[in-house]
């Protein structure tokens, strides 16, 4: 067995698990949200969008838009089109605590969340300064830089720039220093308790670092961040979700557990998440081994087919499951990565639907493995039932040569002609199905 074959065998489990780890592996569910199909020699992995309505037609429409985080660019274009039909889109993104807004029931809670938001924005300002050798001149410049790096941060940035009382944070930059300011509950300078002015300056540590590693005026620090999922996507010849979708859109809102909350819950319970640890340690042994194996199977159709079958099989097994443990996850990972993060999404959905004027339609845009739990909650809590489904092809690999594809096209065209000649009146249903196959086959002709 050659090295590439050994690598493919070694990745049979871990590669498909890596793709699912972002969304938390499989979920117990009545409806499948992932599947693999082989049609005319073409192996495809697909994810589902399911629309939920009350049987009497009243109330909200909620769509569960399942996604896999690596796929063809055309797949993500299709997903964006589906999401465009909903008034509000709730998307997953584990971010710092201050990225989810400053809403609170009391002034004390608003103050604490405003402090979290200011810390989050300052961390983005630190990233700007490290990359550019100077502070951002304005919040607008900081936003443009941040969103250019990751569009998922567009809405979190906007949320964090508004304090708990609905006023925009102040920002001043001069002489290499900067500070963020909230005037507190009373909106006026001075005050105490909840009316206390909140002022968050540039970190002194960063000032020292900047002087020690001062950049020339036009020099920029290279971005050396590594992404295991990008390397996985490159090995499969597909794209990353986060780099294929522009999240800076009206109505797109982050809905997830803050990273600090995930870690705090684990610490309080004395637990460890092997999945979170692997993903957070870029220089760890597990990631290093995965990178080594991926380098050996890059652009391998055999490897891509294996991953498609593994992902589809996981989704179909989840759809059949009616209870018990979720395959591939330990008890801790199952609870923290799926259950508790899903609870945060449902809380945000409940807030939206509880408004005096709720949105007419909401999409939950999450890893397909989360959807079974969401579906059960929609049914039990809001009486919503699945009304329609659309399957989208995330990636595929062709087993057939161009010659064989052309031969199948000719055979189907001949069959359609014979059906039409024999029974013109009843030919439509059969010919319509064959026409769809023809359309897919013609796309594969080189």
Locate the predicted segments by residue.
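Zymogen propeptides
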Residues: 23-92
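Short, surface-exposed beta-strand/loop micro-motifs that present aromatic residues
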Residues: 46-54, 167-172, 179, 350-351
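Extracytoplasmic/secreted cell-surface and envelope-processing proteins
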Residues: 72-75, 97-103, 191, 371-375
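Hydrophobic, often amphipathic alpha-helical segments used for membrane interaction and targeting
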Residues: 23-29, 38-41, 101-102, 203-361, ...
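Bacterial N-terminal signal peptides that target proteins for export
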Residues: 1-7
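Low-complexity, acidic interaction segments enriched in glycine
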Residues: 111-213
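Acidic/histidine-rich, surface-exposed loop or edge segments in extracytoplasmic proteins
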Residues: 58-69, 99-105, 327-332
